[in-house]
Amino acid sequence: MPPKRKTLNAAAEANAHADGHADGNADGHVANTAASSNNARFADLTNIDTPGLGPTTTTLLVEPARSKRQRVSRACDQCRAAREKCDGIQPACFPCVSQGRSCTYQASPKKRGVQTGYIRTLELALAWMFENVARSEDALHNLLVRDAGQGSALLVGKDSPAAERLHARWATSRVNKSITRLLSGQAAQDPSEDGQSPSEDINVQDAGAKTSDFPHAPHLTFSAPKSSTAETRTLPGPVRPPISANTLENNLQPDGTGIGKLPPNHWRLLDIYFSYTHSWLPILEKKDMYQALYQYSEQGSLLPSANVESGVHAELWSALALASFQAAATAASSATGPASAAHGHDNAINPSPADISDTARKLIPLESGPFQVQHCRALLLLCLVSLGRDDWESAWLLVGFAVRVLLVVRTQLPPDDDRPRPRMRALLVACFIVDTIVSMRHNVPAHLKPDDIADLPLPEDGQDQWEPWTPCEGLGGEHTMLQMLRNPAYPLSTFNHLYGVTKLVALELLPRIRTSSQNAPLEFRSRLQQVIGHNSPFSVFVLSQDTASAFVPTAYLTRTVYLWAAAFSEPLNEHYSHLLIETLDQYQKRFGTYAIPPLIPSLLDSLLALKKQSHSSERHRRHLEELFPAYSSIWPRGGRHSNTGLQPIRQLELPPTATATASIMPHVMEQPLSTSINPVNDRFNGIPNPTPYNSDAALDAITQTNDYGSVNTHGILSTYPPPATHLNEASVALAPGGAPPRPPPPYVDSTTNHPPYHSNLVPMANFGYSTVDYDAMVDDLASIEYTDAVDVDPQFMTNLGFVPGCNFSDISTYEQ
């Protein structure tokens, strides 16, 4: 065995020696490497211990292994052309030097596949776009995860025409060329040097489906609406030049003044709108409002990807305008002096409510159109803004414009498309409600007649119907307690009630009043009660016999409209008016003064004008004149009666002497029911009366009759007790601003010795206090033979729960 291994070692040495003479060749070092490897392998064999033979020894020295040849990163131009091995040494490689030829490295490399760093460059470019282009990440994410996989198929599909179109656009884009130049070591050129983008030369109509063809895909283009050539305006207000596309874009894009940006408190304004307007006028779609709001950046400016032509921006800004006036009036009530928040001229950051309203009006096309159903909603909300500012001319014109825009849009709908019909019908009903109330207040023709609308009601089963109502903090009222209750406001039921009462008044009551009918017949009161119904959510509260309490504002609004119609049907009966005043007073205490809908002032003014024409008692009219105008002046006025600030709400101080009190007491004795007027009721002064109700021609034939001595027991509220019923203590536990509830009115019976309940501190409407000498008033009340008036009406004691014919003398004797 040892001689045989020696022969192998000798052969290996001979081979290595023979290979050593080939070092002069270009591949000599490769052969040496192979020989060294063989020597190492044979050396390992010589060191193997053979079992039973003992360790083996070798008599030859093994050479160390040489390093493996490394591949050069780049060969020279000459070796590459001759297909020779090159060591890559610059400026001249060894093969070129040995052959005496020039060596150059000038040819540009042409690598196969993507260039080095291409994927990372695209990733960094996307990350930069996510940081600098607002909501671009959300748009791309929605494309990937939504639409039943259609968006992901667009990006990863191979045979999709839309994918081919997008890939062709990227391949010819300036960004792709710039990235290619950067990765190849060249400087990226200015895009202006390339001229027009090659992507603009692609015929997108023939290249396949667009991204926008997929459902809910975000719009990636910024297009301006068609400019209007009209030079006249049909709406009131300052005359402005025609609104062009550039003007519209400039209004929506951020500028130095901040107009055109969303107000910083836009989320709060939207909450105010949904809590205090959408709860009784559900004409907007919440999802559309949120979707439109997300098309603005965090700074409030409109994103370039937003669709400016959509009318949803007009209704969004109109809703913000309506809520901004309510928020500004609330802020002004807690500040001294004129409210700068309402006009905003000294605040360059927050736009004023008037500026927001102007922006909303600019987003609505002129009479030449084109119109969408959202423009009708925006016009109707701007009409409510004008009503709140006591600018009835603008309100009347705006609601007329909204009606005609709606009729135009309805004619453009496809005959076989019934999807938008329910919302269009609800919008038509909303226009009818507002139009009827505005026309009744100012005795002007209505744009819609009751016969123009088919019998409803609208379906009362939807998401809006069952959403819990949440108050907004800062508008006054008992928001802490109400937030814990989370009761539904039933917007759809409230909307149907408003429509039913308004249509009944317009269909049956107004014609009778214009034909000199003194009071509505019993059929009207019966139908009025049927409109509310006994199965509706608020039937118990609306038809209650006393001033009950509720926890949502829509219940108070329904009761207010119901009592207004009842009082309108019997202008000489003061019972409904007293209940109406108490309901509004409780509404104000629970939800705040500025949460009252703008329709309420029109209802009150029309009722006051009717009572003036029907020759009701002077004391009652004077009381209404002092109270009603306060509700129509809570917002900054506009139009011809424009004011510079909000009118503070104050209280009329009662006459401090007994003489002044005694002067009005004979009027109290004329009607027993009039004693329900609380002498400590909150009243207001310092506010001018609104424009008189011009209804002389319509009501000139109404004859004067005797005042009612008691409640008509056959009426719709036949079981009502005297209107002097006290408010429920639980319902008025807190007043706005933390003021305690108003004490109940004093009641004095001359036949008893019980001391009257009175207080020397009277809470005012501005939540202050004023000292009043009630001792003199109580003495005067005690000197009046009030029991005589009670004996005249036996039904009075029956309503209190006693047997007919019972008087307070009998009760006092029984107690003793």
Curated annotation (Swiss-Prot):
Positions with biased composition (Polar residues): 184-202
CDD domains, alphabetized: fungal_TF_MHR, GAL4
Record keywords: Activator, DNA-binding, Metal-binding, Nucleus, Quinate metabolism, Transcription, Transcription regulation, Zinc
Key word Phosphoprotein present: no
Its biological purpose: Transcription activator; part of the qa gene cluster that mediates the catabolism of quinic acid (QA) and as such, allows the use of QA as a sole carbon source. Activates the expression of qa cluster genes by binding to a 16 base-pair consensus sequence 5'-GGRTAARYRYTTAYCC-3' present in the promoters of the target genes. Regulates its own expression.
Record GO terms (molecular function): DNA binding; DNA-binding transcription factor activity; DNA-binding transcription factor activity, RNA polymerase II-specific; zinc ion binding
One of the protein's GO biological processes: positive regulation of transcription by RNA polymerase II
SMART domains associated with the record: Fungal_trans, GAL4
Gene Ontology cellular-component annotations: nucleus
Annotation: DNA-binding region: 76-103
Top-rank taxon, per record: Eukaryota
Region (Disordered): 184-235
Location(s), subcellular: Nucleus
Protein source organism: Neurospora crassa (strain ATCC 24698 / 74-OR23-1A / CBS 708.71 / DSM 1257 / FGSC 987)
InterPro entries: Metabolic/Drug-Res_Regulator (IPR052783), Transcription_factor_dom_fun (IPR007219), Zn2-C6_fun-type_DNA-bd_sf (IPR036864), Zn2Cys6_DnaBD (IPR001138)
Recorded name of the encoding gene: qa-1f
Gene induction: Expression is induced in the presence of quinic acid. The expression of qa-lf appears to be autoregulated.
Residue intervals passing through the bilayer: none
Protein name as catalogued: Transcription factor qa-1f
